[in-house]
Protein backbone atom coordinates (compact mmCIF):
# COMPACT_ATOMS: atom_id res chain seq x y z
CA UNK A 1 0.00 0.00 0.00
CA UNK A 2 1.38 3.41 -1.01
CA UNK A 3 2.10 5.84 1.78
CA UNK A 4 0.05 8.97 2.27
CA UNK A 5 2.97 11.15 1.16
CA UNK A 6 3.16 9.16 -2.04
CA UNK A 7 -0.59 9.39 -2.48
CA UNK A 8 -0.70 13.16 -2.03
CA UNK A 9 2.41 13.78 -4.11
CA UNK A 10 0.35 13.06 -7.20
CA UNK A 11 -2.27 15.64 -6.35
CA UNK A 12 -0.64 18.67 -8.01
CA UNK A 13 -2.39 21.35 -10.04
CA UNK A 14 -1.04 21.91 -13.57
CA UNK A 15 0.68 25.32 -14.02
CA UNK A 16 -1.23 27.97 -15.91
CA UNK A 17 -0.04 28.84 -19.42
CA UNK A 18 1.33 32.29 -20.26
CA UNK A 19 -1.73 33.03 -22.39
CA UNK A 20 -3.97 32.27 -19.45
CA UNK A 21 -2.02 34.65 -17.23
CA UNK A 22 -2.25 37.38 -19.86
CA UNK A 23 -5.96 36.80 -20.23
CA UNK A 24 -6.41 37.26 -16.49
CA UNK A 25 -4.46 40.51 -16.56
CA UNK A 26 -6.49 41.72 -19.51
CA UNK A 27 -9.72 40.94 -17.80
CA UNK A 28 -8.64 43.05 -14.84
CA UNK A 29 -7.57 46.00 -16.95
CA UNK A 30 -10.27 45.82 -19.59
CA UNK A 31 -13.58 44.56 -18.18
CA UNK A 32 -15.57 42.58 -20.74
CA UNK A 33 -19.21 42.46 -21.37
CA UNK A 34 -21.00 40.07 -19.06
CA UNK A 35 -23.11 38.85 -21.84
CA UNK A 36 -20.09 37.87 -23.87
CA UNK A 37 -19.35 34.17 -24.50
CA UNK A 38 -17.14 32.11 -22.07
CA UNK A 39 -13.50 32.14 -23.02
CA UNK A 40 -11.48 28.89 -23.61
CA UNK A 41 -9.38 29.64 -20.54
CA UNK A 42 -12.36 29.38 -18.23
CA UNK A 43 -13.42 26.12 -19.83
CA UNK A 44 -9.95 24.68 -19.22
CA UNK A 45 -10.04 25.73 -15.56
CA UNK A 46 -13.39 24.05 -15.07
CA UNK A 47 -12.10 20.89 -16.67
CA UNK A 48 -9.04 20.89 -14.40
CA UNK A 49 -11.24 21.28 -11.31
CA UNK A 50 -13.27 18.25 -12.31
CA UNK A 51 -10.09 16.13 -12.59
CA UNK A 52 -8.96 17.07 -9.10
CA UNK A 53 -12.35 16.21 -7.70
CA UNK A 54 -12.08 12.74 -9.22
CA UNK A 55 -8.68 12.19 -7.61
CA UNK A 56 -10.01 13.32 -4.26
CA UNK A 57 -12.89 10.90 -4.52
CA UNK A 58 -10.49 8.05 -5.32
CA UNK A 59 -8.29 8.98 -2.34
CA UNK A 60 -11.31 9.11 -0.06
CA UNK A 61 -12.41 5.66 -1.18
CA UNK A 62 -8.90 4.33 -0.62
CA UNK A 63 -8.91 5.61 2.98
CA UNK A 64 -12.35 4.15 3.59
CA UNK A 65 -11.19 0.75 2.32
CA UNK A 66 -8.09 0.88 4.54
CA UNK A 67 -10.17 1.75 7.57
CA UNK A 68 -12.55 -1.12 6.89
CA UNK A 69 -9.66 -3.57 6.62
CA UNK A 70 -8.18 -2.33 9.93
CA UNK A 71 -11.57 -2.74 11.56
CA UNK A 72 -12.41 -6.18 10.24
CA UNK A 73 -8.97 -7.79 9.63
CA UNK A 74 -6.34 -5.87 11.63
CA UNK A 75 -3.67 -8.60 11.40
CA UNK A 76 -4.00 -9.24 7.66
CA UNK A 77 -0.57 -9.33 6.10
CA UNK A 78 1.32 -9.71 9.43
CA UNK A 79 3.77 -12.64 9.39
CA UNK A 80 3.32 -13.78 13.09
CA UNK A 81 0.08 -12.87 14.84
CA UNK A 82 -1.04 -13.09 18.46
CA UNK A 83 -3.07 -16.16 17.55
CA UNK A 84 0.04 -17.75 16.07
CA UNK A 85 1.90 -17.06 19.33
CA UNK A 86 -0.89 -18.60 21.41
CA UNK A 87 -0.92 -21.66 19.15
CA UNK A 88 2.85 -22.03 19.55
CA UNK A 89 2.50 -21.90 23.34
CA UNK A 90 -0.19 -24.57 23.22
CA UNK A 91 2.06 -26.81 21.15
CA UNK A 92 4.89 -26.46 23.69
CA UNK A 93 4.88 -29.59 25.86
CA UNK A 94 5.04 -28.14 29.39
CA UNK A 95 4.00 -30.45 32.23
CA UNK A 96 2.37 -28.38 34.96
CA UNK A 97 1.03 -31.25 37.05
CA UNK A 98 1.43 -31.09 40.83
CA UNK A 99 4.57 -32.95 41.90
CA UNK A 100 6.46 -32.23 38.69
CA UNK A 101 10.01 -30.98 39.15
CA UNK A 102 11.06 -28.06 36.99
CA UNK A 103 14.21 -26.01 36.64
CA UNK A 104 13.79 -22.28 37.02
CA UNK A 105 15.64 -19.00 37.37
CA UNK A 106 14.80 -16.54 40.13
CA UNK A 107 14.42 -13.02 38.72
CA UNK A 108 12.76 -11.09 41.54
CA UNK A 109 12.56 -11.41 45.35
CA UNK A 110 10.83 -9.62 48.20
CA UNK A 111 9.90 -10.25 51.83
CA UNK A 112 7.01 -12.54 50.84
CA UNK A 113 8.71 -14.74 48.26
CA UNK A 114 10.26 -14.88 44.80
CA UNK A 115 9.21 -14.87 41.16
CA UNK A 116 10.72 -17.67 39.09
CA UNK A 117 10.99 -18.09 35.33
CA UNK A 118 10.26 -21.73 34.47
CA UNK A 119 9.67 -21.19 30.71
CA UNK A 120 5.89 -21.45 31.11
CA UNK A 121 3.10 -19.09 29.96
CA UNK A 122 3.63 -16.96 33.03
CA UNK A 123 6.16 -16.70 35.85
CA UNK A 124 5.85 -19.03 38.85
CA UNK A 125 5.80 -18.01 42.50
CA UNK A 126 7.84 -19.31 45.45
CA UNK A 127 6.50 -18.19 48.84
CA UNK A 128 8.83 -17.63 51.78
CA UNK A 129 7.14 -20.52 53.64
CA UNK A 130 8.06 -22.90 50.81
CA UNK A 131 11.58 -21.56 50.32
CA UNK A 132 13.37 -23.54 53.05
CA UNK A 133 12.96 -26.47 55.42
CA UNK A 134 13.81 -24.09 58.27
CA UNK A 135 11.75 -21.11 59.32
CA UNK A 136 12.96 -17.91 57.68
CA UNK A 137 11.66 -14.35 57.37
CA UNK A 138 13.09 -13.58 53.92
CA UNK A 139 13.96 -15.85 51.02
CA UNK A 140 17.47 -14.40 50.89
CA UNK A 141 18.14 -16.09 54.26
CA UNK A 142 17.98 -19.36 52.31
CA UNK A 143 20.36 -18.06 49.64
CA UNK A 144 17.59 -17.33 47.13
CA UNK A 145 18.60 -14.28 45.09
CA UNK A 146 17.93 -13.04 41.54
CA UNK A 147 19.87 -15.09 39.01
CA UNK A 148 19.86 -18.29 41.07
CA UNK A 149 19.06 -21.39 39.03
CA UNK A 150 17.50 -24.23 41.01
CA UNK A 151 15.21 -27.22 40.73
CA UNK A 152 11.71 -26.65 42.13
CA UNK A 153 8.61 -28.80 42.53
CA UNK A 154 5.12 -27.66 41.47
CA UNK A 155 2.70 -27.74 44.42
CA UNK A 156 -0.32 -25.86 43.06
CA UNK A 157 -1.79 -23.11 40.92
CA UNK A 158 -2.81 -19.57 41.75
CA UNK A 159 -6.48 -19.29 40.74
CA UNK A 160 -6.36 -15.51 40.34
CA UNK A 161 -3.82 -15.46 37.49
CA UNK A 162 -3.21 -19.17 36.68
CA UNK A 163 0.45 -18.88 37.73
CA UNK A 164 2.12 -21.96 39.20
CA UNK A 165 3.16 -22.27 42.85
CA UNK A 166 6.59 -23.76 43.59
CA UNK A 167 8.37 -25.28 46.57
CA UNK A 168 11.95 -25.95 47.61
CA UNK A 169 10.90 -27.06 51.08
CA UNK A 170 9.32 -30.29 49.81
CA UNK A 171 12.50 -31.23 47.95
CA UNK A 172 14.60 -30.52 51.04
CA UNK A 173 12.29 -32.71 53.13
CA UNK A 174 12.80 -35.62 50.77
CA UNK A 175 16.57 -35.18 50.93
CA UNK A 176 16.44 -34.95 54.75
CA UNK A 177 14.58 -38.26 55.07
CA UNK A 178 16.99 -39.88 52.64
CA UNK A 179 19.93 -38.59 54.68
CA UNK A 180 18.42 -39.93 57.93
CA UNK A 181 17.95 -43.38 56.39
CA UNK A 182 21.58 -43.32 55.28
CA UNK A 183 22.80 -42.31 58.75
CA UNK A 184 20.71 -45.06 60.33
CA UNK A 185 22.17 -47.64 57.94
CA UNK A 186 25.68 -46.48 58.81
CA UNK A 187 24.80 -46.59 62.53
CA UNK A 188 26.52 -43.29 63.21
CA UNK A 189 26.14 -40.86 66.08
CA UNK A 190 24.71 -37.43 65.26
CA UNK A 191 24.45 -34.30 67.35
CA UNK A 192 21.05 -32.63 67.50
CA UNK A 193 19.67 -29.54 69.20
CA UNK A 194 16.82 -30.02 71.67
CA UNK A 195 14.04 -27.63 70.63
CA UNK A 196 11.16 -28.80 72.79
CA UNK A 197 9.73 -31.34 75.21
CA UNK A 198 6.43 -33.08 75.98
CA UNK A 199 5.14 -35.65 78.44
CA UNK A 200 6.87 -38.50 76.64
CA UNK A 201 10.27 -37.08 75.86
CA UNK A 202 12.32 -34.50 74.02
CA UNK A 203 11.98 -33.05 70.52
CA UNK A 204 15.28 -32.62 68.67
CA UNK A 205 16.05 -31.14 65.26
CA UNK A 206 17.89 -33.62 63.02
CA UNK A 207 18.71 -32.71 59.40
CA UNK A 208 15.88 -30.18 59.56
CA UNK A 209 13.36 -32.81 60.75
CA UNK A 210 11.72 -32.98 64.17
CA UNK A 211 12.80 -36.17 65.90
CA UNK A 212 11.42 -37.67 69.11
CA UNK A 213 13.66 -38.86 71.95
CA UNK A 214 11.70 -40.81 74.62
CA UNK A 215 12.67 -40.12 78.22
CA UNK A 216 13.56 -43.81 78.53
CA UNK A 217 16.23 -43.25 75.87
CA UNK A 218 17.94 -40.33 77.62
CA UNK A 219 21.06 -41.19 79.60
CA UNK A 220 21.29 -37.92 81.49
CA UNK A 221 19.38 -37.44 84.73
CA UNK A 222 18.98 -33.74 83.99
CA UNK A 223 15.47 -32.32 83.71
CA UNK A 224 14.02 -31.66 80.27
CA UNK A 225 14.17 -27.91 80.85
CA UNK A 226 17.92 -28.13 81.45
CA UNK A 227 18.44 -29.81 78.07
CA UNK A 228 16.50 -27.25 76.02
CA UNK A 229 18.59 -25.46 73.37
CA UNK A 230 21.48 -27.87 74.04
CA UNK A 231 23.04 -30.35 71.63
CA UNK A 232 23.00 -34.01 72.62
CA UNK A 233 24.40 -37.11 70.87
CA UNK A 234 21.78 -39.36 69.29
CA UNK A 235 21.46 -42.57 67.32
CA UNK A 236 18.59 -43.48 65.03
CA UNK A 237 16.05 -46.01 66.27
CA UNK A 238 13.26 -45.67 63.70
CA UNK A 239 13.10 -43.74 60.41
CA UNK A 240 9.67 -43.96 58.74
CA UNK A 241 9.00 -41.28 56.14
CA UNK A 242 5.51 -42.55 55.25
CA UNK A 243 4.38 -42.27 58.87
CA UNK A 244 6.57 -39.17 59.42
CA UNK A 245 8.05 -41.00 62.38
CA UNK A 246 11.59 -40.27 63.51
CA UNK A 247 12.66 -41.83 66.82
CA UNK A 248 16.15 -41.45 68.31
CA UNK A 249 18.09 -42.59 71.35
CA UNK A 250 20.54 -40.66 73.47
CA UNK A 251 21.26 -43.70 75.63
CA UNK A 252 22.56 -45.76 72.70
CA UNK A 253 24.70 -42.89 71.47
CA UNK A 254 26.29 -42.39 74.89
CA UNK A 255 26.90 -46.12 75.30
CA UNK A 256 28.68 -46.30 71.96
CA UNK A 257 30.69 -43.19 72.75
CA UNK A 258 31.79 -44.65 76.06
CA UNK A 259 32.90 -47.83 74.34
CA UNK A 260 35.30 -45.74 72.28
CA UNK A 261 36.80 -44.00 75.31
CA UNK A 262 39.94 -46.04 75.74
CA UNK A 263 42.45 -45.21 78.45
CA UNK A 264 45.07 -42.88 77.01
CA UNK A 265 42.98 -41.72 74.06
CA UNK A 266 42.85 -38.00 73.25
CA UNK A 267 39.47 -36.39 72.70
CA UNK A 268 38.22 -32.89 71.99
CA UNK A 269 36.09 -31.34 74.72
CA UNK A 270 34.32 -28.15 75.71
CA UNK A 271 34.42 -26.71 79.24
CA UNK A 272 30.87 -26.78 80.62
CA UNK A 273 31.34 -25.50 84.16
CA UNK A 274 33.98 -24.82 86.81
CA UNK A 275 33.99 -26.10 90.37
CA UNK A 276 36.52 -25.58 93.18
CA UNK A 277 37.72 -29.18 92.70
CA UNK A 278 37.89 -29.20 88.90
CA UNK A 279 36.20 -28.55 85.56
CA UNK A 280 33.43 -30.53 83.87
CA UNK A 281 34.21 -31.16 80.22
CA UNK A 282 31.70 -32.22 77.55
CA UNK A 283 33.33 -34.88 75.36
CA UNK A 284 30.74 -35.77 72.75
CA UNK A 285 27.70 -35.75 74.99
CA UNK A 286 29.49 -37.29 77.97
CA UNK A 287 30.58 -35.18 80.91
CA UNK A 288 34.05 -35.89 82.19
CA UNK A 289 35.84 -34.42 85.19
CA UNK A 290 39.17 -32.69 84.80
CA UNK A 291 40.30 -32.64 88.42
CA UNK A 292 42.33 -29.64 89.53
CA UNK A 293 45.26 -31.96 90.27
CA UNK A 294 45.19 -33.22 86.65
CA UNK A 295 45.32 -29.82 84.95
CA UNK A 296 49.08 -29.29 85.23
CA UNK A 297 52.19 -30.55 86.98
CA UNK A 298 52.43 -27.09 88.50
CA UNK A 299 49.98 -26.21 91.23
CA UNK A 300 46.76 -24.53 90.09
CA UNK A 301 45.28 -22.41 92.86
CA UNK A 302 42.44 -20.94 90.77
CA UNK A 303 41.01 -22.94 87.86
CA UNK A 304 39.51 -19.80 86.33
CA UNK A 305 43.02 -18.53 85.56
CA UNK A 306 43.54 -21.51 83.24
CA UNK A 307 40.07 -22.44 81.94
CA UNK A 308 36.77 -20.71 81.22
CA UNK A 309 33.33 -22.13 80.32
CA UNK A 310 33.09 -22.51 76.55
CA UNK A 311 36.82 -23.14 76.06
CA UNK A 312 37.68 -25.93 73.61
CA UNK A 313 40.59 -28.13 74.58
CA UNK A 314 42.16 -31.53 74.12
CA UNK A 315 42.07 -33.91 77.07
CA UNK A 316 43.27 -37.44 77.65
CA UNK A 317 41.07 -40.19 79.08
CA UNK A 318 42.63 -41.13 82.39
CA UNK A 319 39.99 -43.58 83.61
CA UNK A 320 36.47 -44.64 82.67
CA UNK A 321 33.96 -46.25 85.02
CA UNK A 322 31.28 -47.51 82.64
CA UNK A 323 29.07 -48.82 85.41
CA UNK A 324 28.90 -45.48 87.19
CA UNK A 325 29.24 -43.42 84.01
CA UNK A 326 32.24 -41.50 85.29
CA UNK A 327 35.14 -40.35 83.14
CA UNK A 328 38.34 -38.87 84.54
CA UNK A 329 40.36 -36.58 82.29
CA UNK A 330 43.84 -35.13 82.27
CA UNK A 331 45.80 -32.40 80.55
CA UNK A 332 48.66 -32.87 82.98
CA UNK A 333 49.75 -36.07 81.19
CA UNK A 334 49.86 -34.14 77.90
CA UNK A 335 52.37 -31.50 79.02
CA UNK A 336 55.70 -31.77 77.14
CA UNK A 337 57.26 -29.83 80.02
CA UNK A 338 55.74 -29.51 83.51
CA UNK A 339 53.71 -26.31 83.73
CA UNK A 340 53.07 -25.93 79.97
CA UNK A 341 49.31 -26.06 80.51
CA UNK A 342 49.58 -22.83 82.50
CA UNK A 343 52.22 -21.08 80.42
CA UNK A 344 51.55 -22.37 76.89
CA UNK A 345 48.35 -24.44 76.53
CA UNK A 346 48.53 -24.19 72.72
CA UNK A 347 51.76 -26.21 72.76
CA UNK A 348 50.09 -28.82 74.96
CA UNK A 349 47.26 -29.29 72.44
CA UNK A 350 49.70 -29.45 69.50
CA UNK A 351 51.75 -32.18 71.20
CA UNK A 352 48.72 -33.96 72.70
CA UNK A 353 48.71 -37.06 70.46
CA UNK A 354 52.48 -37.44 70.74
CA UNK A 355 52.43 -37.25 74.55
CA UNK A 356 49.42 -39.57 74.74
CA UNK A 357 51.25 -42.13 72.62
CA UNK A 358 54.16 -42.05 75.10
CA UNK A 359 51.70 -42.48 77.96
CA UNK A 360 50.06 -45.49 76.29
CA UNK A 361 53.45 -47.10 75.70
CA UNK A 362 54.30 -46.76 79.38
CA UNK A 363 50.92 -48.25 80.29
CA UNK A 364 51.49 -51.16 77.90
CA UNK A 365 54.94 -51.83 79.38
CA UNK A 366 53.55 -51.73 82.90
CA UNK A 367 50.79 -54.16 81.97
CA UNK A 368 53.33 -56.48 80.32
CA UNK A 369 55.46 -56.41 83.46
CA UNK A 370 52.44 -57.21 85.58
CA UNK A 371 51.48 -60.16 83.40
CA UNK A 372 55.06 -61.39 83.40
CA UNK A 373 55.16 -61.28 87.18
CA UNK A 374 52.04 -63.41 87.27
CA UNK A 375 53.57 -65.90 84.81
CA UNK A 376 56.57 -66.40 87.10
CA UNK A 377 54.27 -68.43 89.25
CA UNK A 378 52.62 -70.22 86.30
CA UNK A 379 55.42 -72.22 84.59
CA UNK A 380 52.82 -74.35 82.78
CA UNK A 381 52.25 -71.35 80.47
CA UNK A 382 55.70 -71.85 78.97
CA UNK A 383 56.60 -68.15 79.44
CA UNK A 384 58.73 -66.33 81.95
CA UNK A 385 60.41 -62.96 82.50
CA UNK A 386 64.17 -62.85 82.02
CA UNK A 387 66.52 -60.96 84.31
CA UNK A 388 66.48 -57.96 81.96
CA UNK A 389 62.68 -57.74 82.08
CA UNK A 390 61.93 -59.33 78.68
CA UNK A 391 59.04 -61.77 78.44
CA UNK A 392 60.10 -64.98 76.68
CA UNK A 393 59.96 -68.75 76.64
CA UNK A 394 60.60 -70.67 79.82
CA UNK A 395 64.38 -71.02 80.27
CA UNK A 396 66.83 -72.37 82.77
CA UNK A 397 66.03 -69.67 85.30
CA UNK A 398 63.17 -71.81 86.58
CA UNK A 399 63.17 -75.56 87.02
CA UNK A 400 61.15 -77.56 84.52
CA UNK A 401 58.79 -78.75 87.25
CA UNK A 402 58.15 -75.18 88.36
CA UNK A 403 58.51 -73.60 91.76
CA UNK A 404 57.13 -75.57 94.66
CA UNK A 405 55.30 -73.09 96.86
CA UNK A 406 53.63 -74.41 99.94
CA UNK A 407 50.77 -72.70 101.70
CA UNK A 408 53.15 -71.47 104.37
CA UNK A 409 55.17 -69.59 101.75
CA UNK A 410 52.19 -67.44 100.66
CA UNK A 411 51.75 -64.37 102.89
CA UNK A 412 48.30 -63.69 104.25
CA UNK A 413 46.27 -60.62 103.25
CA UNK A 414 46.79 -59.23 106.75
CA UNK A 415 50.55 -59.50 106.45
CA UNK A 416 50.47 -57.78 103.09
Curated annotation (Swiss-Prot):
Keywords: Acetylation, Chloroplast, Plastid, Repeat, Ribonucleoprotein, Ribosomal protein, RNA-binding, Transit peptide. Induction: By heat stress (at protein level). It comes from the Eukaryota. GO terms for molecular function: mRNA binding. Residues 9-21 have a biased composition (Low complexity). Pfam families: S1. Residues 99-169, 187-251, 264-332 form the S1 motif domain. It is found in: Plastid, Chloroplast. One of its GO terms (cellular component) is chloroplast stroma. Disruption phenotype: Reduced plant size and pale green leaves. Its main location: plastid. Residues 1-44 form a transit peptide. The keyword Ribonucleoprotein applies. Residues 1-34 are annotated as: Disordered. The modification N-acetylalanine is found at residue 45. The keyword Transmembrane does not apply. PROSITE patterns: S1. Part of the 30S ribosomal subunit. Belongs to the bacterial ribosomal protein bS1 family. Required for optimal plastid performance in terms of photosynthesis and growth. Required for the translation of plastid mRNAs. Involved in cellular heat stress response and required for heat tolerance. Required for transcriptional activation of HSFA2 and its target genes in response to heat stress. Plays a critical role in biosynthesis of thylakoid membrane proteins encoded by chloroplast genes. This is Small ribosomal subunit protein bS1c. The gene is RPS1.
